[in-house]
Amino acid sequence: MELPKEMEEYFSMLQREIDKAYEIAKKARAQGKDPSLDVEIPQASDMAGRVESLVGPPGVAERIRELVKEYGKEIAALKIVDEIIDGKFGDLGSKEKYAEQAVRTALAILTEGVVSAPIEGIASVKIKRNTWSDNSEYLALYYAGPIRSSGGTAQALSVLVGDYVRRKLGLDRFKPSEKHIERMVEEVDLYHRTVSRLQYHPSPEEVRLAMRNIPIEITGEATDEVEVSHRDIPGVETNQLRGGAILVLAEGVLQKAKKLVKYIDKMGIEGWEWLKEFVEAKEKGEEIEEEGSAESTVEETKVEVDMGFYYSLYQKFKSEIAPNDKYAKEIIGGRPLFSDPSRNGGFRLRYGRSRVSGFATWGINPATMILVDEFLAIGTQLKTERPGKGAVVTPVTTIEGPIVKLKDGSVVKVDDYKLALKIRDEVEEILYLGDAVIAFGDFVENNQTLLPANYCEEWWILEFTKALNEIYEVELKPFEVNSSEDLEEAADYLEVDIEFLKELLKDPLRTKPPVELAIHFSEILGIPLHPYYTLYWNSVKPEQVEKLWRVLKEHAHIDWDNFRGIKFARRIVIPLEKLRDSKRALELLGLPHKVEGKNVIVDYPWAAALLTPLGNLEWEFRAKPLHTTIDIINENNEIKLRDRGISWIGARMGRPEKAKERKMKPPVQVLFPIGLAGGSSRDIKKAAEEGKVAEVEIALFKCPKCGHVGPEHICPNCGTRKELIWVCPRCNAEYPESQASGYNYTCPKCNVKLKPYAKRKIKPSELLKRAMDNVKVYGIDKLKGVMGMTSGWKMPEPLEKGLLRAKNDVYVFKDGTIRFDATDAPITHFRPREIGVSVEKLRELGYTHDFEGNPLVSEDQIVELKPQDIILSKEAGKYLLKVAKFVDDLLEKFYGLPRFYNAEKMEDLIGHLVIGLAPHTSAGIVGRIIGFVDALVGYAHPYFHAAKRRNCFPGDTRILVQINGTPQRVTLKELYELFDEEHYESMVYVRKKPKVDIKVYSFNPEEGKVVLTDIEEVIKAPATDHLIRFELELGSSFETTVDHPVLVYENGKFVEKRAFEVREGNIIIIIDESTLEPLKVAVKKIEFIEPPEDFVFSLNAKKYHTVIINENIVTHQCDGDEDAVMLLLDALLNFSRYYLPEKRGGKMDAPLVITTRLDPREVDSEVHNMDIVRYYPLEFYEATYELKSPKELVGVIERVEDRLGKPEMYYGLKFTHDTDDIALGPKMSLYKQLGDMEEKVKRQLDVARRIRAVDEHKVAETILNSHLIPDLRGNLRSFTRQEFRCVKCNTKFRRPPLDGKCPICGGKIVLTVSKGAIEKYLGTAKMLVTEYKVKNYTRQRICLTERDIDSLFETVFPETQLTLLVNPNDICQRIIMERTGGSKKSGLLENFANGYNKGKKEEMPKKQRKKEQEKSKKRKVISLDDFFSRK
């Protein structure tokens, strides 16, 4: 593939800069001051490559390449079937042989070379007869157990291919008898109950439907010794469970039905209409019924009814696309719900992709961000109703903002950011939230039915140009500059100014015709009224509009005007007392108006927008059955309307935006162990000043020339490179590297494996003084090290590096690098002024033209971003500037090399290279800084974000856990559902809050023991193209992503390898079920497979970061944090595998390899669905009214996928919506600025109260049930199971020492869970049940929880518990009094249930109050120290 000169120069320039950095790093490393003499991050242009292993016949490979290139793999697979059966690859003998070869080969193509599916998964292919029916021939596919590893998609495709082969061979359908059908119904249920839980357990009706309609027989050999009751069925060779056939039917055809329909349409295979109906019924939530199963004695009679177009569309919409409330079932305290599912007034769907949206990102008007109290900021994450589950928010100014009602009753349309700031404190109600621009590609990616498009400017301009062409035969194109000749001709016909017409066509989103001109266009061109002047007519019932019409006709004072014979209203004044209920109709119309004194005033242009559709009141508006308001208007009025408010989408706030330096917890400046000598702050300088000696596990080195021993790699006396000292853990004998290697790292005396470290005493004062002298840094306040090294080598960093970090105020991560984390946000185009870069500088960086091909001369021109260029937040710029100064100091003072960055301000970093690394990934990607924005996000090309890879397991991987004290195995998919509070970050879903008491079994490699540990988070990520399947000698197996860390036993120790580095014969550990001892088992077979599902899963285990999966196989989890960037040279100089934690799968959150040249074909396939057009065609908008599937329109709108393999995949991408500034909007979500939870929840509910599309009482109920109550109950449980902690050395105890002092250091012992931590949300919860209409049951749960907390502390610490005086206004006490007879007032509880408790007071009976006071006097509050020191 030959790239244009400019793009080739770009990649060459990147490689030159990378090579330059590597050369500098090599010179530095060659000095021997680091653990390795080489740079430890290799370059790679392709991480693993594509793996294709096709199955015969001989000579087919070249033909497949030709056909795939010409037709794509789906059609190529069918063409190959044709050619195999036609004998083009030789005579195979029988029909059965042809069928078997064709099925296996086609399936191998469709699964891109999956070996297990076409070979092991299909045991055989046979041609059999329907002997119980008409004796016709049919095709039978025999599936084996290993078909499971091929995944549901491959399983389903094999059935599809089998049907195509059947047709090609001229065979009849499989015609199952009732016995065949009921046998499969029994098998599916029996398998699910007795053998293994199916990922998808179909109902008996679904199994019957599939069995009756699938044209081939899905059968197989016996896989499990479980007998069935439907026995001796003709044509079925076994009376035991056929596991392979069950999996193909349930987890293949039925579970993957939606995906299979895609392939059916793409491949043009007929006879599968039943499956499309099945998918549609499932989407609507309908029960599956067999044909003819519902009896009817009454013949249906079709009656013609007069039904309006929009009424009919609404009915169809409601019946086919139900609101999806899954996102709103959990609401976190402090994170608002912005709209109920599909609620009118929520986010208005606007199809398109702005230059900063698409790829799971929504563009919204920054005015919306302001008016939801800035809970939304640039980069804030949303949980969404559709098309996907989550999205990031970015600003788009060319779409509509909110429409709000002010406290004085006026209604204002707020499209302008400055106006939003001005009126924010006057808003009483948000009537309409505003637009959310969502890309067509996101609907394709999620295979979501297209919702009816809301009428908008980009649709109107297409109808405008179409009408011009049809009526006047003038062909003008929207969103571009048209020829002067065509413009002049059209301007004459339309009687408009040519310059205005030019701007209207070039930028219809910003250029609005005056209302009288819009009416003129509608009249002469016969097009609907411009959407800007179209109100939300269908949000108001026709009966309400009829009442409004009468008020206007009888009481309104109207100022009329005229334009070219067109009558239009300029101003309307309506007495407020006459409007009454109709005032609400004006508000719901979204009509801007003012309330002045006793009048409602509608000014220009909105007076015309109101009266023109009503025929200027010249015809009577009357409500009509089965008609919407717009239907009635369109039947009576000359100027027609389109509905601008059909489709609405719900959303709630997810995680707030992030842009912050990465720090370890607690922060570290140098990876150097100081033990207890540095105190709780691990301050090496403090330990040195106090002359302390640190006793730590550390690697030491010995000079072969003068014998000096110390942690430095270079001898401070003679400058010689030292040798590592290996130590015998038994006899403590020491051997330098040269000697140890001769003994094969085994002690010759004890025959024990040597260790590269030992517990030794070091003097921080000597080491620090020498380091300070070396780099001439003396004036630092602190130097923070680590308590102990977690790596297998225990090699410390040179102290000089820590001193230089401290001097520059930067912090190190576990691998030696310095990182900055940020929320990912996509961008494909930018303006120079937005990123603070001059045109001259951009030209130096290779940006010579704007995206339309014009020479770059202005900072306001729009420029297309190159794929590996990134735009960082200013916060990142400030921090990376410090990092650059650190690197320069390091080069100059430590390595004696010239400074590299020479940066004095962050703009000096423009043009320099970084490494981008995502969580749960292995490889970094090289990027180039081209600018900075004032927003807490990391803007980069969607390709760049998609290039960060993820490592996880398939969802059916079983993992050993302990739930509520009971050991059990669950699938990772099930584990994910046991956690709450899902958020979306960097293209993965993360949950951190367990619903139950759950721990995971982990493996301690040092001691060879199985241990229990906490789960920090569970992760769900989009599946990669391939997985690797490992089959072990004892028959067990597991699958994982190709870059996943795998724990391997090699040369007497545990090492971590990436999955693709593991070889057959490598040793993997399995835990013996009975003895819990580790067994060493060899890898027998390795193969590449397709992922069984669209997602893969993993978790972070807290301590050893290993997990036990499937048949007790020990392996690493995946690991990681936020997406991060690091300066390339910092990583090359300071990263070392010797620093990486030995027990951590976290090695994969390290730049073990970097991709230097991005190939869009090999990044996350989600980006392949991103649309790249300037506007969506008219055909698209019209198709949405038919509720079409997005796959029906993939040929209409160009996507990245259409350019893969062509030079154009790198450039020439377009967008539909511009924005004035990619950083316009709140910089930080209010959520991050508020204090305690009660304050956050109050503000959250304030927003809910104001938004018309939200029921605040329902929000309060959901917050309680999904967040506060589970937290309160969980914290209560945690208190009873907590550990105790030493405040000095942080040692933890399951049970505290009797004297209350740490036996290690004598420090105080404290609780790890306090009473305050347990009840921190109790006040908030009681506020919610008091002020909002929540269910009685929920109120009582809160009160019971409070009682449990009080009861616990009274029982456990009776002397320390301070009993509060009873507060008669406390809701829980009122309920208790009601139940116990303390209050004789009837109906009190019911009053509370209905929210009537505000301001009511009732005195406690005097006798009871006195008793409580006496009880409280006997109790006192004491400290924990006093408690432990009691005699």
Curated annotation (Swiss-Prot):
Keywords per UniProt: Autocatalytic cleavage, DNA replication, DNA-binding, DNA-directed DNA polymerase, Exonuclease, Hydrolase, Multifunctional enzyme, Nuclease, Nucleotidyltransferase, Protein splicing, Transferase
Matching Pfam families: Intein_splicing (PF14890), PolC_DP2_cat (PF24846), PolC_DP2_central (PF24844), PolC_DP2_N (PF03833)
Any GO BP: DNA catabolic process
Post-translational modification: This protein undergoes a protein self splicing that involves a post-translational excision of the intervening region (intein) followed by peptide ligation.
E.C. designation(s): 2.7.7.7, 3.1.11.1
Ranges where the record places region Disordered: 1388-1431
Domain of life: Archaea
Entry annotated with the keyword Cell membrane: no
SUPFAM superfamilies: Hedgehog/intein (Hint) domain
Biased composition (Basic and acidic residues): 1399-1415
GO molecular-function term, one example from the UniProt record: identical protein binding
InterPro entries in alphabetical order: Hint_dom_C, Hint_dom_N, Hint_dom_sf, HNH_nuc, Intein_C, Intein_N, PolC_DP2, PolC_DP2_cat_dom
Keyword Nucleotidyltransferase (UniProt): yes
Similarity remark: Belongs to the archaeal DNA polymerase II family.
Functional summary from the UniProt entry: Possesses two activities: a DNA synthesis (polymerase) and an exonucleolytic activity that degrades single-stranded DNA in the 3'- to 5'-direction. Has a template-primer preference which is characteristic of a replicative DNA polymerase.
Subunit architecture: Heterodimer of a large subunit and a small subunit.
The protein's name in its UniProt record: DNA polymerase II large subunit
Lineage, top ranks: Archaea, Methanobacteriati, Methanobacteriota, Thermococci, Thermococcales
Gene: polC
